[in-house]
Amino acid sequence: MESRMDQYELMEQIGRGAFGAAILVHHKAERKKYVLKKIRLARQTERCRRSAHQEMSLIARVQHPYIVEFKEAWVEKGCYVCIVTGYCEGGDMAELMKKSNGVYFPEEKLCKWFTQLLLAVEYLHSNYVLHRDLKCSNIFLTKDQDVRLGDFGLAKTLKADDLTSSVVGTPNYMCPELLADIPYGFKSDIWSLGCCIYEMAAYRPAFKAFDMAGLISKVNRSSIGPLPPCYSPSLKALIKGMLRKNPEYRPNASEILKHPYLQPYVEQYRPTLSAASITPEKPLNSREGRRSMAESQNSNSSSEKDNFYVSDKNIRYVVPSNGNKVTETDSGFVDDEDILDHVQQSAENGNLQSVSATKPDGHGILKPVHSDQRPDVIQPRHPKTIRNIMMVLKEEKARENGSPMRSNRSRPSSVPTQKNNVETPSKIPKLGDIAHSSKTNASTPIPPSKLASDSARTPGSFPPKHHMPVIDSSPKLKPRNDRISPSPAAKHEAEEAMSVKRRQRTPPTLPRRTSLIAHQSRQLGADISNMAAKETAKLHPSVPSESETNSHQSRVHASPVSTTPEPKRTSVGSAKGMQSESSNSISSSLSMQAFELCDDASTPYIDMTEHTTPDDHRRSCHSEYSYSFPDISSEMMIRRDEHSTSMRLTEIPDSVSGVQNTIAHHQPEREQGSCPTVLKDDSPATLQSYEPNTSQHQHGDDKFTVKEFVSSVPGPAPLPLHVEPSHQVNSHSDNKTSVMSQNSALEKNNSHSHPHPVVDDVIHVIRHSSFRVGSDQPVMESVEVGVQNVDMGKLINVVRDEMEVRKGATPSESPTTRSIISEPDSRTEPRPKEPDPITNYSETKSFNSCSDSSPAETRTNSFVPEEETTPTPPVKETLDIKSFRQRAEALEGLLELSADLLEQSRLEELAIVLQPFGKNKVSPRETAIWLAKSLKGMMIEDINNNNSSGSSRNCS
């Protein structure tokens, strides 16, 4: 039988993903180019095989102008899944950004792409498809520069029995709830799309950090840099609105498309959607389709409470003309279960006004009917001007309240709070204000005609980035005025309990889903009227507030969840402060299918022991991250820039000298390439509070190497240093081939700290590892005594001062008297801009060999710093490795040392000295030279000691 592959002519491979290759093919009969995605099934896990088949079946059902065209798919010989899609001549968005050479896209073009992507995402979500891997490299461009969304390898159709909690995707685009291992829904795609638009606007990822801990911290704080000033405030506010930490407050795709700023683009590109349709695996009837969507969206305990649209294939619900209304007999203590009874009963009777009043638009999507478009059955509204004023007042009130990621149903409260800097949602019946980035005076009425347009240009207006449609679901509220609002403490405890409960439970079923919507619906009208009542009471204390009498108590008592804002949980990796430089990023090019969690509960992705703080300031609170990343070492790619770094010291107490000898931890740094690397730190000497058995590098703080000055004047009381056995120094030597390159990385040397005063000689050799400030700058060496922490601001000043000192001194001059001896509170550390490739592996191995041959021998180092009690600091010698004179002297000393060792038959030490040399050796010549000088210095000390001891014996 002829294979389908015979219809295509293979041209070239144009890409490679996590599971297969993308090949450009030419259809022989059609004479048209396509892309063949070939996924190999052999040697794949069952999950990967299932994912491949899922992608094949899913993309075959998806048809949309802004989603890659599907041609055909089949399984080739039982070994490969072949998927043929349309070819996008423009490449992907990531490539286009690289080719632009830093020239930003025009805002018109960016908004065009933004709108097209939103339409594609809206289409997917309306058909229950979660993409889960939205990123710039999966956004393709046609020759006409139109967008095509592709790569559905991680996409998932949400069903009633799905947990939707698998940790998949690309780290830089993962939403906070996914990183926190909270079940997530469609709002996770909104977050990822916001990251994409941010990156397309700023040419840099929205979130990047040294490692996973730093990335999680930034994502949890929604800490993004400023967007280029060439873009309008409306666009910036739209992007920021998509990156709200709490998924409940993120707008969905339909809401963003309703924003006035995007309307010209929506009108231009939406008409092409008339032919878009989807062929479900089985027909979705109205009741089951709505039930399936409701239950599947509940897989995120705090998402999609307002995204209740169904496709045009479904039977549309119409608000009945009869006068059936949902009444509340005891609104003071209405629970979700009580709401459920009303919702189910009304749904069975065909009356869905308690859930949502909807109408079909021209494209088959049911959309919420705004308050001014409701039938007469619904409760009367306030006049338009009053509603607009109340909306502004609601904004002002909502700004005072913050909601953490897991607090799903936090309501605005009148309790005074210090959370003034946190953006909070406003349940306001106006969708046009999603993207305003200013602050409006609460007491100033705004004309309704200017509210949507002028507020975007008002310098002081506040951004209500998330607005839900008005849902007056309970026409007549019957409040119980005899109820008393619970105290803030009781409410806080109730909310904490609910938050913990939500973290542990599985996604609820349909009753829970619909009850949340009804619960939310019942609250909106009361919220607005309550705000107006409060403001009226402030302006006219003597006038009783009718709105407050009618609606305040029912709103407060509608849920056991607190209306007091929960203190923001600040999750920062260390109490001493974490430096997460924006120039260092986790790779954004790898889809982390292997990052997916195992099903058993014994491998938690992250366990936050959080300490809540009363205000929202991002201070460094003690939080413990416990990681257990299964099967991550081969999948996760971590990149390191060589231009900046954060530092932390790991200290070893020295009870003999009182000097804290600081062990240097070399963290591996790599040029931004495609070589996957996982940072590992198994040293128990780190200061972070992590479990010692984790295999992942556990913190965003880098350690740095502490160097010593090479003093030409030996100290009067040098420190005796013992040699430790070789098993106490762990080194990684798996990068021998890459170290010799120009931008090769420092090999990490994990040294264990010990409470006793035994310190390995390796420390001193490591401290000689020199960093170059520039290509023509001399080596910077320093001694640190009792260093506590490193302050980057002071550090840079110290480096500049030292550079100025060195510029004034040549290598031939006498040693300068200026040296930097760190007091306990001083900070000094060279900033490595172009690090020398240093290999601690050879040095460590060589000294370990020495220690094995003479473990009990005590040696004094000629370049050990003086003791802290010595009033005169050691003299620093300016060393320039590139100086031919010094290099010649060092090489001469190396030859003399080798000859002496050979003459004394000390072959083991001779082998150690010569070990770094050779074609296949990773240690550079400079390191070997210093190694030789160090050994020679120690030998001279040994000879002097032996001579002095021999002369003393002769005298006796």
Curated annotation (Swiss-Prot):
The keyword Transferase applies. Its EC number is 2.7.11.1. One of its GO terms (biological process) is cortical microtubule organization. It comes from the Eukaryota. Keywords: ATP-binding, Kinase, Nucleotide-binding, Serine/threonine-protein kinase, Transferase. The keyword ATP-binding applies. One of its GO terms (cellular component) is cortical microtubule. Residues 276-307, 349-379, 397-509, 535-588, 666-701, 715-757, 803-876 are annotated as: Disordered. Residues 403-416 have a biased composition (Low complexity). Residues 8-262 form the Protein kinase domain. Signal peptide: none annotated. It is an enzyme of class 2 (transferase). Belongs to the protein kinase superfamily. NEK Ser/Thr protein kinase family. NIMA subfamily. This is Serine/threonine-protein kinase Nek5. It comes from Arabidopsis thaliana (Mouse-ear cress). The gene is NEK5.
